């Protein structure tokens, strides 16, 4: 095996791990929704969409056997993670500043009209308000955990893109 193949194999393992982490985070969100009765708000649902996109892109990239395809999908992962960072930061700012709203009246019908909300309503239907603060986990609010998750994913994928940028030339 040459260095090219070994590096691609390591990258594919990282992408599989990333995909499984997204599945675990989504499973945790469903646990909080159905066991702890913490209803998701529009921004929560948007964050779920970003985690789903990251997971799908990661699993597809893990199945690709050339660097160019992996690079394109990692770029899409980075874009989704950046969108997730922005959404989670907005959600966190709403929860830390009482009296602010996520615009439930305008956001809720848009989020609920997306096709996945019709196909999987238990996962993607809005049922709560963004300003509702649920008990923190280890002292961090739920949007804070999402922000940490998106930021770690973004840093890991951007570092990977930077580290392997020369492989695209070959």
Swiss-Prot record:
Residues 32-49, 90-144 are periplasmic. InterPro entries: DiS_bond_form_DsbB/BdbC, Disulphide_bond_form_DsbB, DsbB, DsbB-like_sf. It comes from the Bacteria. The chain crosses the membrane at residues 15-31, 50-64, 72-89, 145-163. GO terms for molecular function: electron transfer activity; protein-disulfide reductase activity. Disulfide bonds join 41-44, 102-130. The keyword Disulfide bond applies. GO terms for cellular component: plasma membrane. Keywords: Cell inner membrane, Cell membrane, Chaperone, Disulfide bond, Electron transport, Membrane, Oxidoreductase, Redox-active center, Transmembrane, Transmembrane helix, Transport. GO terms for biological process: protein folding. It holds the Pfam family DsbB. It is a multi-pass membrane protein. Belongs to the DsbB family. NCBIfam families: PRK02110.1. Required for disulfide bond formation in some periplasmic proteins. Acts by oxidizing the DsbA protein. Required for the production of extracellular protease. PANTHER family: DISULFIDE BOND FORMATION PROTEIN B. This is Disulfide bond formation protein B. It comes from Burkholderia cepacia (Pseudomonas cepacia).
């Amino acid at each position: 095996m040459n260095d090219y193949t070994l590096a691609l194999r390591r990258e594919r393992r990282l992408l599989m791990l990333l995909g499984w982490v997204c599945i675990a985070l989504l499973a945790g969100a469903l646990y909080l929704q159905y066991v702890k009765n913490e209803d998701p708000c529009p921004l929560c649902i948007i964050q779920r969409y970003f985690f789903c996109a990251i997971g799908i892109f990661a699993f597809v990239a893990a199945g690709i056997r050339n660097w160019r395809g992996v690079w394109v999908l990692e770029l899409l992962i980075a874009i989704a993670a950046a969108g997730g960072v922005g959404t989670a930061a907005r959600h966190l700012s709403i929860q830390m500043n009482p009296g602010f709203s996520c615009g439930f009246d305008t956001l809720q019908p848009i989020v609920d009209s997306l096709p996945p909300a019709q196909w999987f309503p238990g996962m993607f239907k809005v049922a709560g308000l963004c300003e509702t603060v649920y008990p923190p986990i280890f002292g961090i609010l739920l949007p804070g955990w999402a922000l940490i998750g998106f930021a770690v994913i973004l840093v890991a994928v951007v570092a990977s893109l930077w580290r392997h940028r020369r492989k695209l030339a070959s």
